[in-house]
């Protein structure tokens, strides 16, 4: 019984985190950088001042071009992540199609804050440039 209940909560955490992740990605894809910045974890905000982060993410989105599609390829809940405090973490991997890239994969790490809200803790990606064909 415990494992069924635990799995149910894990699924809820993953689904809730994925909604926040997709909303955040939608914000950065549609120049809603202020909204996106507000969803960053405090640790990220401490590393990247507001204006610097907005400049960086804007340049990145210009490089990628317009989003054509995005599909979740992996989702994983963990309560422990090496080098980080214990908590609730969700890793999500997306296969994305952008105008200027190919074989584009986006990775999000979300962390639940002390108010039980999911926040973006890390964003990473890999791709090949379409011009390299």
Residue ranges and their predicted role:
Residues 18-19, 34-87:
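Short solvent-exposed beta->alpha transition segments
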Residues 74-133:
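Exposed beta-sheet edge and beta->alpha loop/turn motif
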């Amino acid at each position: 019984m415990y494992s069924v209940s635990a799995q149910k909560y894990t699924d809820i955490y993953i689904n809730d985190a994925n909604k926040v992740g997709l909303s955040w990605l939608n914000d950065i894809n549609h120049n809603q950088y202020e909204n996106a910045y507000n969803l960053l974890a405090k640790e990220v905000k401490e590393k990247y001042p507001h204006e610097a982060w907005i400049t960086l993410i804007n340049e990145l989105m210009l490089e990628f071009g317009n989003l054509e599609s995005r599909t979740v390829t992996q989702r994983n809940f963990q309560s422990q992540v090496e080098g980080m405090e214990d908590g609730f973490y969700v890793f999500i991997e997306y296969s994305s199609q952008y105008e200027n890239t190919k074989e584009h994969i986006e990775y999000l790490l979300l962390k639940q804050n002390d108010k039980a809200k999911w926040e973006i803790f890390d964003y990473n990606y890999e791709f090949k440039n379409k011009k390299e064909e």
